[in-house]
Amino acid sequence: LLLLLALKTLWAVGNRFEAQIIGGREAVPHSRPYMVSLQNTKSHMCGGVLVHQKWVLTAAHCLSEPLQQLKLVFGLHSLHDPQDPGLTFYIKQAIKHPGYNLKYENDLALLKLDGRVKPSKNVKPLALPRKPRDKPAEGSRCSTAGWGITHQRGQLAKSLQELDLRLLDTRMCNNSRFWNGVLTDSMLCLKAGAKGQAPCKGDSGGPLVCGKGKVDGILSFSSKNCTDIFKPTVATAVAPYSSWIRKVIGRWSPQPLT
């Protein structure tokens, strides 16, 4: 009975598909100054989060095109507002987690900018978890944001959308009725507050924030049907990788994290 009740509350974005926000709300402009739009020569592809003046954290699977064709745009609210074009940087170096694979395990990548971001009201880094054990607990209230599609098979959002989420028990999400054992301990399983709400195509790589002041997860994958209740959206927990992230940043940018 408990499982059936849980089924009614689940949502998702059965095959894995890059996480993409349906049923969200427009964010207050520039209320999430850490948000990044990863774009190719044509349009927005994925989200990301500024974690250092020279580094962005995103999902490794988002790097499906040559780096020369990609750019990072900061300080955006609307994707196509000529009056507010944002701040653009190109990628000098991309470092995927060495354990990343096509099962979306360890789905993280660090992108080094070709310059340094000057913190401002609209562009500001989000802190990393301090310890590897600082994963948010089951039941935690979280939120995410992105410019992903707002309807199944629809178009990208015109402005930044946000969505409230709650963390589910990963063991339940690994049940044969759900993800059937594919989730690892470093993955976070998520549900929205209402049926028909979910991150969707274009939201991969965006940050999951639980509480205040730090990035707790990076949106990773879901099903092709964004709101499939049997396939909750999955994020990569950042805390277990905090040492790796700091090591990479420290190696290539020998200065204190900001």
Swiss-Prot record:
Which Gene Ontology molecular-function terms are recorded?
A: endopeptidase activity; serine-type endopeptidase activity; serine-type peptidase activity
Task: List the disulfide bonds in this chain.
Answer: C46-C62, C142-C210, C173-C189, C200-C226
Q: Write down the glycosylated positions.
A: N174, N225
Give the UniProt keywords, A-Z. Answer: Apoptosis, Cytolysis, Disulfide bond, Glycoprotein, Hydrolase, Immunity, Innate immunity, Protease, Secreted, Serine protease, Signal, Zymogen
Entry's Gene Ontology cellular component terms: extracellular space
A Pfam family (short name) is Trypsin
Annotated EC: 3.4.21.-
What is the active site of this protein? H61 (charge relay system), D107 (charge relay system), S204 (charge relay system)
User: What GO biological process terms are annotated to this protein in UniProt?
Assistant: apoptotic process; innate immune response; killing of cells of another organism; protein maturation; proteolysis; T cell mediated cytotoxicity
* Matching CDD domains: Tryp_SPc
Where is the protein localized?
Secreted; Cytoplasmic granule
Give positions of region: Disordered.
Answer: 122-141
Ranges for the Peptidase S1 domain?
21-250
Task of the protein: Cleaves peptide substrates after methionine, leucine, and norleucine. Physiological substrates include EZR, alpha-tubulins and the apoptosis inhibitor BIRC5/Survivin. Promotes caspase activation and subsequent apoptosis of target cells.
**What's this protein's family per the entry?**
Belongs to the peptidase S1 family. Granzyme subfamily.
PANTHER family registered for this protein in UniProt: GRANZYME M, KALLIKREIN-RELATED
- Name-wise, this protein is Granzyme M
Q: Where does this protein come from, organism-wise?
A: Rattus norvegicus (Rat)
